[in-house]
Amino acid sequence: RVYDNIRKSIQFLLSSNLAEVLTILVATLLGFTILEPVHLLWINLITDCFPALALGMERGEPEIMRRRPRDPKDGIFAGGMGFDVAWQGLMVTAVTLLAYFSGLLLTCPVQMDWAALVHITDPLAHKTGMTMAFFTLSMAEIFHSFNMRSRRASLFSMGQNGYLWGAMVLSLVLSTVVLYVPALAAAFDFVPLSGTAYGASMALALAVIPVVELVKAVQRAVHR
């Protein structure tokens, strides 16, 4: 159980940090700013910290006593964990980038081509996109922590982890406060999101759950 929980926390943190690195890398290569250093600091201190600790409190999985003894030579990435970290990081990167461009499209009054979107000059549109990217990334990582309760079993077959629910509520409240309290929003260079933009960000973030559930189902079928 202890070793399992350590691996879950490591996989969560690595996939989350990979998503942040890839998001910044793609934005830099395309020539725009999607997140500022203070945003990443907030995500690493607030969004990632509490769920990682909560995963360490996870109960043992039901089939844990039916597993074969673990090979002492196996590394921390054994059993396909490295692959899972990679594709899950790419998944969170994709929803974050989609959130940014959704913010631009929701704000700009006219149709814009790809070049105009990448090199946006409207300050309000850029701030809206950046705010949506931040909120989507924050919540996607929170929801992804629920995926990490088991590497193969469905989230919906697991019992409750009150610590993880508490971490989610705390992160949701704090991340929302940053968007809507004027002094904090100004410090983070955010703009208040409309109901549509807030809902779109939440929907994009939630998408990580069905995607991971689908992949887990395929993995269970392959290894049956």
Model-inferred region functions:
Residues 1-152:
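Membrane-embedded transport module
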Residues 56, 135-224:
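C-terminal transmembrane module of polytopic membrane proteins
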